[in-house]
Design a protein with these regions (language model features):
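Conserved beta-ketoacyl condensing-enzyme motif
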Residues: 22-113, 118-136, 189-213, 287-288, ...
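Active-site-proximal alpha-helical scaffold in enzymes
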Residues: 87-118, 155-185, 256-263, 328, ...
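Conserved catalytic cysteine-centered active-site region
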Residues: 25, 57-111, 142-149, 222-249, ...
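N-terminal extracellular/periplasmic Venus flytrap/periplasmic-binding protein-like
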Residues: 11-13, 24, 28-33, 44, ...
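Phosphate/pyrophosphate-binding loops at sites that engage ATP/ADP/AMP, CoA/4′-phosphopantetheine
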Residues: 38-51, 154, 158-159, 265-269, ...
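Active-site pocket-shaping loop/turn-to-helix segments
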Residues: 13-39, 59-62, 85-99, 138-146, ...
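Glycine-/small-residue-rich "gating" segment that lines the acyl/pantetheine channel
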Residues: 121-159, 163, 218-243, 395
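Condensing-enzyme catalytic core mediating Claisen C-C bond formation in acyl metabolism
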Residues: 1-27, 223-291, 295, 360-361, ...
């Protein structure tokens, strides 16, 4: 079986949904912009070498429908002969697309694929016609729970305190602030000029303005534990513990990752960041979907005869602090190996792109820190965990 490598990964900055820099920007336009940037950054790879585009999207409807993977390919500098498709596994869609690309390369179908994902929650328009399967809703009601309600289930069922959630959320904000100060994200972010709808809070008047998204805009470095403790629960106002402060932020953005056979990378003279070593998913009860990594991580490690101690860096998506705290403690992941530069609580979480962002970031971390193995993992709506294994490419 052929070795598969991660050659490069780029993304937009992450903007706040509805009131941030991408509130008028389509996801296929974001993807086309960073695909072009990927081509520009890798001039030794001719555009015609890219055989397919695989893009993840958490809610591929409305502005995100009509196969944004193919649309992005057509909008970009890629030739018309490059295909494109869109995949959905909710919050793991971005890493799912990378896994699908890697699997097809391993099988000999392709040599070069650009994978990734996008989400614009600002423009998301869900089609609710016939949305609910009545038999499914009756037999497994948790599958239709809002994600925040599943977080409350985890908090109550497994006794994860409000204090532990807020402490984790505070640490995430501080780590992202430090990462931004040190430039830890700079190499992966591609600035994008766009138009933003700016609304005057006092008058309600709105106008379009020229705007450049050149960094992540969601971090709140002024966050305090006292401020987090003062926030009211959102999903269970009377007895809950999940707040806006200890949950991931709604945001807009896109990420693409260049996935290639090792032989093709050598042929083109490209220096990969990491090997793709494996990927797995596993289901859990839908009403506690946040603990999905507790299922998929052991399965992944067993598949490759590894233990938690063998992994040098972990990227565990911060959908909610409660599920990160639970999975961290249950799996035995040390905090000094986990989400070293913060995560979705402090950076933002455009559902379809986060997995690709995490893969790109952990690949760089492995190189910058001279570490060997990294795992990216996340919970998934509907009750699942998804996990991927990556290894630093030797210098």
């Amino acid at each position: 079986m052929r070795n598969v490598v991660i050659v490069d990964s780029v993304r937009t900055g992450l903007a706040k949904s509805h009131r941030g820099g991408f509130n008028m920007t389509r996801p296929d336009e974001m993807l086309a912009h960073i695909i072009d940037a990927m081509l520009d950054r890798n001039p030794d790879m001719p555009p015609e070498a890219v055989e397919d585009i695989i893009m993840g999207c958490g809610n591929p409807e409305g502005a995100q429908g009509h196969n944004i993977g193919r649309n992005a390919a057509v909008l970009s500098k890629l030739p018309m002969t490059t295909g494109g498709t869109t995949v959905n596994r909710y919050c793991s869609s971005g890493m799912q697309s990378i896994s699908m690309a890697a699997s097809q390369i391993m099988a000999g179908c392709y040599d070069t694929v650009i994978a990734g994902g996008a989400e614009t929650i600002s423009m998301m328009n869900m089609n609710m016609d016939n949305f609910v399967n009545e038999r499914l809703a009756e037999e497994v009601p948790g599958i239709y729970f809002p994600m925040g309600m599943t977080a409350e289930v985890v908090a109550k069922r497994y006794d994860v305190s409000r204090e532990a959630q807020d402490e984790y959320a505070f640490e995430s904000q501080m780590r992202t602030a430090a990462a931004q100060q040190s430039g830890a994200y700079d190499d992966e972010i591609i600035p994008m000029e766009t138009k933003m709808l700016l609304t005057n809070k006092e008058t309600g008047d709105s106008k379009e303005v020229e705007y450049t998204v050149d960094k992540d805009e969601c971090n709140r470095p002024e966050t305090t534990l006292e401020g987090l403790a003062s926030l009211k629960p959102v999903f269970d106002p009377e007895n809950g513990s999940v707040t806006a402060g200890n949950s991931s932020q709604l945001s807009d953005g896109a990420s693409v990752t260049l996935v290639m056979s090792e032989d093709k990378a050598k042929e083109l003279g490209l220096k990969p960041l990491a090997y793709f070593r494996g990927f797995t998913t596993m289901g859990c009860e839908p009403d506690e979907m946040g603990i999905g990594p507790d299922y998929s991580v052991p399965k992944l490690l067993k598949n490759y005869n590894m233990s938690v101690e063998d992994i040098d860096i972990w990227e565990l998506n911060e959908a909610f602090a409660v599920q990160v705290v639970y999975c961290r403690d249950k799996l035995g992941i040390p905090m000094d190996k986990l989400n070293l530069d913060g995560g979705s609580i402090s950076i933002g979480h455009p559902f379809g792109m986060t997995g690709s962002r995490q893969v790109g970031h952990i690949a760089r971390q492995l190189n910058n820190m001279d570490k060997q193995f990294g795992v990216v993992t996340m919970c998934v709506g509907g009750g699942m965990g998804a996990s991927g294994l990556f290894e630093r490419y030797p210098s």
